[in-house]
């Protein structure tokens, strides 16, 4: 039975819009302001790659950022690699994607782990990380802090050989030397050398040894309760996949009628971006699309703050120690004034005395008036 009533939608009148404008403050646009300013300024990210030669570090970096940073690289022979000392090489490139600019710095460590005796071969690398902290601390403590250049290492991809049965002593030594200074993300290199069951066993072994030796690798932050289920699922997959088993390739091959980046073998094709073949996509999503900002935050709020607190503590301790010394400043004997100096001092004293008398007389006259 129809009631015969009609419902009319109420249109917003100019008066209603004015009331809404009065209630609207405007700070809801702050995220947009920050976004515009950040995009205009651009971003910077410093990534260190470490591991023995021949594990595909350069190829993986090229695959991650689609940028060739090693055009002029000279490949060394096995004998040259054995005699090579650890170097620190920086490659910087400006990348732009959809109007967003990224200044990417890759810190390479050729010569690491290639010598017969690798005792403390990570020392030049730890020194480099400390030098960047020190430079930033000096710039931050200076007068001109407007354009501080951030060269701190935000992440270190550490490549683990797939041919061993877990971590080697040099792997443990490197990660323990740097785990309090930089975010370490361990990777199993050249995962196409292993079958899936071998990869799972190697991952379990590496996780056990990381816990056994007390190594602190980068920990993914917990998801907020208001995150959507897709993001939570992606986060769970990232945590379960670590350490990532990766493959890199600069070659485009044809697979099932499509051109993909991968490697061609007699038994088939390994696709770099196929998640059934390796964890490259998970690593790229973590490093670039979801956790790049968190890596920078942890570097600034944890690793750099620890270094800064240590520096301030050392400075305070040194000042306290100096103040407790009996004679921190040597007391030099004062020179004996000669006759001319004594005469000059007497003249100055006489002049001061006359000025005081004049001031006293002027003050007395003002009181009498």
UniProtKB/Swiss-Prot annotation:
Disulfide bonds: none
Xref: InterPro entries: G_SEPTIN_dom, P-loop_NTPase, Septin
Region (G3 motif): 108-111
Residue positions where Phosphothreonine is found in the record: 13, 336
GO molecular function: GDP binding; GTP binding; GTPase activity; identical protein binding; molecular adaptor activity; phosphatidylinositol binding; protein homodimerization activity; syntaxin binding
Coiled coil: 338-369
Taxonomy, superkingdom: Eukaryota
Sites where the protein binds GTP: 51-58, 85, 111, 190-198, 248, 263
Post-translational modification (record): Phosphorylated by DYRK1A.
Principal subcellular localisation of the protein: cytoplasm
Subcellular location(s) per record: Cytoplasm; Cytoplasm, Cytoskeleton
Limits of the Septin-type G domain: 41-314
One Gene Ontology term, aspect cellular component: axon terminus
Expression tissues: Expressed in brain and testis and at lower level in heart, spleen, lung and kidney.
Pfam family, one: Septin
PTM sites of type Omega-N-methylarginine: 168
Region (G4 motif): 189-192
Region of interest (G1 motif), ranges: 51-58
Phosphoserine PTM positions: 225, 327
Function: Filament-forming cytoskeletal GTPase. May play a role in cytokinesis (Potential). May play a role in platelet secretion.
Assembly mode: Septins polymerize into heterooligomeric protein complexes that form filaments, and can associate with cellular membranes, actin filaments and microtubules. GTPase activity is required for filament formation. Interacts with SEPTIN2 and SEPTIN5. In platelets, associated with a complex containing STX4. Interacts with PRKN; this interaction leads to SEPTIN5 ubiquitination and degradation. Interacts with DYRK1A. Interacts with STX1A; in the cerebellar cortex.
Homology family: Belongs to the TRAFAC class TrmE-Era-EngA-EngB-Septin-like GTPase superfamily. Septin GTPase family.
Identification of the protein by name: Septin-5
Organism of origin: Rattus norvegicus (Rat)
